[in-house]
């Protein structure tokens, strides 16, 4: 879908231009969302699919970054939104 490709391109752009740990974390976040959205066969993305993409992104950042709720990281802002 267009949404999946846009999210994937955001992740690629961040990976090319943003250095340090933040760049890696944001790249992981957007690439995980891209994977979930791309799996959708619909031309439009539903709110449920956006929520699933956010949950997958949070899980990926937690997995690769080693943080979880309460660690005072980006995840503390994202988890309540999911």
Curated annotation (Swiss-Prot):
Start and end residues of each DhaL domain: 1-82
Kinase among keywords: yes
UniProt superkingdom: Eukaryota
Keyword terms: Kinase, Transferase
GO biological process, one term: glycerol metabolic process
E.C. designation(s): 2.7.1.-
GO MF: glycerone kinase activity
InterPro entries: DhaL_dom (IPR004007), DhaL_dom_sf (IPR036117), Dihydroxyacetone_Kinase (IPR050861)
Family assignment from sequence similarity: Belongs to the dihydroxyacetone kinase (DAK) family.
Full protein name: Putative 3,4-dihydroxy-2-butanone kinase
Source organism: Glycine max
Lineage of producing organism: Eukaryota, Viridiplantae, Streptophyta, Embryophyta, Tracheophyta
């Amino acid at each position: 879908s267009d949404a999946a490709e846009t999210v994937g391109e955001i992740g690629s752009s961040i990976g090319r231009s943003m250095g340090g740990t933040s760049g890696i974390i944001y790249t992981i976040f957007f690439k995980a969302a891209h994977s979930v959205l791309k799996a959708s066969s619909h031309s439009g993305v539903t709110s449920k699919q956006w929520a699933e993409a956010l949950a997958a992104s949070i899980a990926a950042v937690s997995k690769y970054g080693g943080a979880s709720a309460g660690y005072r990281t980006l995840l503390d802002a994202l988890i309540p939104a999911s």
